[in-house]
């Protein structure tokens, strides 16, 4: 099964995401800050990366996604966000270029798994 890296500074979200994905048969590696997230992605080469858009670190999820893309990491990136709902903004791939898909917080297990499966299938087609 696919390996997924989940990077989020909120341990509740990190634990819930891991539990949801593992229950569906995915291998999950986690990090609770951008530095550790960068390291685990480089070390484990996951099939999918899940990032929180805002983390209490100098680098947020968007900066980390940009860093991966600049280094040639083509792995699909799904981003957790609560910003679009709070600001009434509709995120799109064109606006947030390095990210392939978004999931709104609070996270729906079915929506998360659906988007993960969609991105993994799309990556296999390439």
Question: Where are the model-predicted features located?
Answer:
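Helix N-cap/capping motif at the beta->alpha junctions
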Residues: 30-39, 60-61
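Two-component/phosphorelay signaling modules centered on CheY-like receiver
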Residues: 11-29, 97
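The C-terminal output helix
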Residues: 117-126
